[in-house]
């Protein structure tokens, strides 16, 4: 499914040569993340980091991609383990990149969970907020040395693309309830917790764009895409889960649904800090997505929480 006024985008034709570039994709063992790696690999970057929750999952996907593409013409793809619900795992993964990667041109923050049951991350954050938002915020923060070094290279074009969702409209009316972020936030419901995490991504992206003008950042909604995200939405009411599985038969296939994030990672028209519906349609669907006072509060809260991981 695509939206009115969607921009035309053909990954095969519209992704330019990626020669010399290094790309990293989180949540890359399945769905949109795996499709991103496949599409990027066809344009010959110097290296792709394929990140999954476990090294076995990452390596299995690397092997699958090598089987799907002509191995002789496939760029190096390195598997990397990172569990976003564990900030120690995030820290370890980021240190590996900083130590081993000479540059980083595209950072695709693709991984996430949806409508999970109430729970906490290893460090005690609400599970969806911690996984979808905090883990990626820390990962990006720790990668700043290599991102800034890359941005200083002549003609470099550093992109940081975050998967948000149209589901940010389900966030609480206040936007982000800070007193729930170190609880399981059961009272918000599965989709309230999900919406809160996805709204935070939009707000963080806007703040990052202001503070790091040398990068191009965007948050995106991929559309309603045929992935296993809804199958794992075990915290959602059973009726919604069933409808989601039925909808999976008719919604956008992954090779089409991936277009918005790929577009955001290469297109010249991207406005840094913007949120995009597919493909290339700008603007949050709720006023809270453009609330810069709330965004600054989210930024300051996040910076305080992540002190000590630098």
Predicted regions, residues:
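Intracellular terminal tails of multi-pass secondary transporters
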Residues: 1-19, 285, 289-310
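Rossmann-fold NAD(P)H-dependent dehydrogenase/reductase core
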Residues: 2-231
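Residues at helix-coil transition
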Residues: 42, 99, 265-269, 307
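Pocket-edge positions in alpha/beta enzyme catalytic cores
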Residues: 50, 82, 249, 287-290
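Residues within alpha-helical segments
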Residues: 59-62, 95, 206, 258, ...
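A short C-terminal helix-loop "cap" of Rossmann-like NAD(P)-dependent dehydrogenase/epimerase domains
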Residues: 72, 183-184, 236-246
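C-terminal helical subdomain
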Residues: 90, 197, 244-284, 292-296
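Short active-site-adjacent structural elements
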Residues: 167, 283-286
